[in-house]
Amino acid sequence: MADGVLLDTSFLITLADKNRDHHETARRYWQHFVENDITIYLSTIVVSEFSVKQAIPPDILRCCIVLPFNWDDALRAAALDWKRVRPEGVERDALKDDIKIIAQAAIADAAYVVTADERSFYRFCETFKSASEISFKPIQLAAGFDRAAFDVNGQSDFEDMLGEGR
């Protein structure tokens, strides 16, 4: 049974940078994951991308299960039809890491992937999900924090709705 959440690089960057749009939403999701003992997966690909600018804080790392990119992940990435999700004018090289992270989430049987990248990563996930190529639910930070993403009945929390002025 699927469980846990895989963090996309853009989520981690947004969580780390108080000046980025959606930082507060990222912080609330992180707090929700930790307080509710939701398994948090961290891809070595995300580690590689994030570590270009800064080290991952030890308190973040301690909460995560690190996923190395392995044989099964590679085969799943190769099987995903990346040509269908490629935006006009974007070369394959720009998509490779996103496809690998998506494949890792599928192989890890994550229930969710959380991202701040709604323009490409989120869109790729939605396209693959609608084609039944993945089963996890993508969560985008731009939509705001919503506990309903984790509720089997899709029930939002009234306090959360009041806090975000919905």
Q: Residues of each region from the PLM?
A:
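Short, surface-exposed acidic-centric catalytic microdomains
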Residues: 46-60, 70-74
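A generic "structured core" feature
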Residues: 1-3, 24-26, 33-42, 73, ...
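Active-site regions of enzymes building and remodeling cell-envelope glycoconjugates
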Residues: 59-68, 133
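Active-site neighborhoods of divalent-metal-dependent phosphate/nucleic-acid chemistry enzymes
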Residues: 68-123, 158-165
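Short, well-structured N-terminal submotif of metal-dependent ribonuclease cores
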Residues: 1-41, 52-61, 148-166
